[in-house]
Amino acid sequence: PLWEEKVRVDANATFSRNRISNYTAWFDQYDNQENYAWMGQISKDYGSTNISYSPDVISAVGLTWQPGKAFYMNLLGKYVSKQFLDNTSDESKSIDAYFVSNLSAGYTFRKTRMGEIDLQLYVNNLLNSAYVANGWAATDSFTDGSTIHWIGYYPQATRNIMARLTISF
């Protein structure tokens, strides 16, 4: 059948459970939030925790249509599960799971005066998803027992388009 020769589906998935069996965190301690005089460090035992930036699931599925030797089109979807920004497994210091899809197409001009020309077009983040794929976290502790969590996120690009031209001679 026609679809067997022209359509390909690729998929992959990684499932993991990355843990620290007995985690102890060290935090800078300050006298108070007004003065911020450094008093040293304190430790806190968390027991078994998730390793930072280690999602439990990463998966992707791609659909490629190639009706001939010169043209192709590919749709790719990628899912990444929740990640923690540090090793404490604190929900407030985590990145939500996200799904992003990309579309690409290409055409090869095989016999030209300049040689072989490949023209490719990419539409990244096709669904224009707002998502975060990385970040940082830190905690300041105070002698009265209070804490401040500093959290920063690195949002990823919304929909963007890129083209590539390759000339082989």
Region roles according to the model:
Residues 1, 61-65, 75, 103-107, ...:
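Residues on the lipid-exposed face of transmembrane beta-strands in outer-membrane beta-barrel proteins
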Residues 55-59, 97-101, 115, 157-161:
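Residues that define the transmembrane beta-barrel architecture of outer-membrane proteins
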Residues 7, 19, 79-84, 108-169:
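C-terminal beta-signal and adjacent terminal beta-strands/loops
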Residues 1-83, 87:
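Gram-negative outer-membrane beta-barrel transporters
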Residues 33-36, 99, 139-145:
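Short alpha-helical linear motifs
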Residues 46, 88-90, 148-150:
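Short structured motifs
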Residues 12, 102, 124-128:
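Asparagine-centered polar/low-complexity signal
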